[in-house]
Amino acid sequence: MGFTLLIDNYDSFTWNIYADLASVGGNPYVVRNDKITLKEIEGMFSDGELERIVISPGPGHPRTDSGVSRDVIAWGMGKLPILGVCMGLECIVDLLGGEIAYAGEIKHGKTSLVQHDSIGVFHNLPQFLSSTRYHSLSAQIQSLPSVLQVTSTTKESGVIMGVRHRTYTVEAVQYHPESCMSEGGRGLMANFIQMKGGKWGGENAWCGVPAEGEEEQPKAKTNGAPSLPTILNRIHAQRLLDVEQAEKVPATSPANVSTSLSLYASPPLINFRDRMVSTPHTAVMAEIKRASPSKGDIAPTASAPEQALKYALAGASVISVLTEPTWFKGSLLDMLAVRNAVDSLPNRPAILRKDFVLSKYMIDEARLYGADTVLLIVAMLEPQQLKELYDYSVSLGMEPLVEVNNPTELSLALEIGSKVIGVNNRNLHDFNVDMSTTSRVNAALNGRDVVLCALSGISSHEDVEKYVKEGVKGVLVGEALMRASDTKAFLRSLIGLPPLEVVPKSRPLVKICGIRSTDDAKLAISAGADLLGVILVPGTKRCISTSTAREISALVQSARSQSSSKPLEPSLSSPWFTTQSDLLSSRRKPLLVGVFQNQSLSDILSAVEEIGLNLVQLHGDEPQAWAKFIPVPVVKVFRVSPEGIVRGGEIRRPGLNQAILLDAGGVSGGGGEGKAFPWEHAKRLIQSGEVGSEGHMPLPVILAGGLTPENVGQAIEQAGEGVWCVDVSSGVEGEGGKVKEKVEAFVKAVRG
């Protein structure tokens, strides 16, 4: 009969291990870590005497205080079973490249409940074993080598209590199973001494650990406890507590959330699946991810709406917002801010609540805070619960993204009718990534009509191309995007798109304002003006009556009927003002603009209806939000002082007025006073760019104030790219109104 070599790392608990091994027939032979050489151990093995090795607990750090232990482990892996206890576990993890660091808690002579995976050394042992702990160090999940998997953790804090090699018969526990206060210690030792040889499977199949290359099947639950005591279980438990606390707060109680939804306090939805399949390229689900359990902090100070705009303007089809606060450092407020930030885009990305959704309440939360879809993780939900949550989400108009990790989970997802399925390449139990997971699941899909997405570990165009060739329609990318130095360029490179470039604009449009008669209108139209402005501000010198305005409108609409529009499909990547200026530029010309100043909204709406205005210009202190209630595009005037101070509202705010007009700070406010402001201020505003574009997309403006045929060319040149229209009134007038030669000269100076 062979023996068990027990390496003593100078710890009194070694003799407890000796007693347990002896009682179950392990025939232990004890030697201290500096009293034996590797050559001697090799000789024992060659002689057929050595059958297994145990590395004992001990003080200190494995690199400095474990003697021959690390060398023995390196030699013995793949040859014979190895069990590490406390210091023994730390030796194994450290040897294989993991990090041994502060466990987050100091436990000396304290007990904790340990939950485990019920296989290997834990075969047939009950869940929630009371265990004795004497340590302050532990393996760190973030750095755990991919060849190791977590087998057990403490129930209350999730500290790693056990690891196992995926290929070799190497097991380790952090706690002390040999202590008289620990449960199941001799059962654990009995399991260990039954193991044979150096690899799982074969004659070790009895203990349930799959051999290398075998598919690990989902474990049954034991006594109601989760079969895999991993980070996933910790998150599951914490999210249940989080939801319970949220439901107790009056403002976020289930009743109040439901009432808010019934009042349509939530933003409007778009169809998640349609947004995915309508994308002309591979759909990118770009994730906002500050941290993760496997990587720790990634971008802890990242602004969610700022990151979302980068993603959206680069062409993302979906923005995934992690709302889990403890491990991922996200929040529901992040998601609401993201939703608001992209709301003004013409074809905005769908918003995904990326969380561990466990209840209908969490789906209601998602809907209220701006999500278009939610993530349902098959691994976290019982089949009946999965079906109930899927159906409930669909009833709210949100087709869920259903996450799977293997063909068994895929079958469950298909059974409930999932239309969009994501394959997580990351195993949520140990957070290791296997990029072939998507390929295996895709093969099991057998061509079914679902939108398949790959969800983890994607960091290059080659990764994406591999999946696209297999029929994958979308990819979720998080960490790689969060770490990218140029987010937009990197996102586009993933799907083979060129970097974003600003398309040079044609020469600016021309607006002739202060039209007072049909004669003025005729000469402006004849000269080629694109927009004609009529002043409808009582008490100003160019104000005209409603009847005159109607006559001018009839003339303008007649001219428009003889012109043609340019077909325009709004770019997926264009921000608000760029999109609106492109749309206005593409319309039939000329367009009639009614100018108002500090008049009531009802007066403005009446004038639009009675006169037939194509646009409205708000020239006073009107709220920008009025633009939502005016049925035609709105030009909002902002006044620029000689010092460059801008007044009139939030000039770069998207989603309200369709156009920005820069004018000098006048007295009457009716325009046409012939005063200019320094055009370098216009250039500064233009170059500040659209919100979220980081200055790469100029802010389109209408330039007004003191322009003449003589200076308009200089004004355009000094203000720079971004002037999409110039506005003139007094600069083309004489004593009797508009002067034909001046109007023609102005248009010619603009167009060259």
Swiss-Prot record:
SUPFAM superfamilies given in the database record: Class I glutamine amidotransferase-like, Ribulose-phoshate binding barrel
Keywords per UniProt: Amino-acid biosynthesis, Aromatic amino acid biosynthesis, Decarboxylase, Glutamine amidotransferase, Isomerase, Lyase, Multifunctional enzyme, Tryptophan biosynthesis
Domain of life: Eukaryota
Gene Ontology annotations of biological process type: L-tryptophan biosynthetic process
Binding site for L-glutamine: G58, P59, G60, S136, L137
EC number per UniProt: 4.1.3.27, 4.1.1.48, 5.3.1.24
Segments of this protein annotated with the region N-(5'-phosphoribosyl)anthranilate isomerase: 509-752
Pathway in which the depicted protein is active: Amino-acid biosynthesis; L-tryptophan biosynthesis; L-tryptophan from chorismate: step 1/5; Amino-acid biosynthesis; L-tryptophan biosynthesis; L-tryptophan from chorismate: step 3/5; Amino-acid biosynthesis; L-tryptophan biosynthesis; L-tryptophan from chorismate: step 4/5
GO molecular function terms attached to this record: anthranilate synthase activity; indole-3-glycerol-phosphate synthase activity; phosphoribosylanthranilate isomerase activity
Start and end residues of each stretch annotated as Indole-3-glycerol phosphate synthase: 231-495
CDD domains: GATase1_Anthranilate_Synthase, IGPS, PRAI
Function: Trifunctional enzyme bearing the Gln amidotransferase (GATase) domain of anthranilate synthase, indole-glycerolphosphate synthase, and phosphoribosylanthranilate isomerase activities.
The protein, known as: Multifunctional tryptophan biosynthesis protein
Underlying gene: TRP1
